Amino acid sequence: LAVATGEPDYRLAANRFWDSVTLRRMTITGHTGPRPEHEAFGEDYELPNNGYYESCAACGLMDFAQRMFLLEGGADSGDVLERVLYNAVMHGISLDGTNSYYQNPLSDTNRNRYNSWVCCPPNLSRTLFQVGRYAYAAGDRDAFLNLFVAGTVQLPMKGGSVGLKIQTEYPW
């Protein structure tokens, strides 16, 4: 709502929530929501290694980080995008890519691949499919690269567009 309306109170609320999540309720790997009840946040700094950390929460945090970048700019939202993508989102997918996980505790090595929830597989797929939306952004006169991913993109800008070609082997 803050981006769509420009309402200052919404902007302040978004920034307060962003700070609460990223400074006090997110693990170093970008996971959030340690409580199994409603995949909920806990108290400030409640970040246990055996927390719940649902895959869809990681996808949602990427969406929130992208919107905060559009609202405020700044490197912190790009840093969160990168941390969550390469750690929390990818943690929800098996190494062979054939399974996904609903829960992603940091210290558990025996995760159950089957669950009755059907939200995570398509949400993880959607997030990975849209990585370009998270990687690039443009303003009237500025182009932004939030994720180091190889690719080519044409970004609309005031009075035209700019093309970018990114060559990298990062993060591999």
Feature names for model-found ranges:
Residues 1-172:
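Glycan-recognition and catalytic cores of secretory/periplasmic carbohydrate-active enzymes
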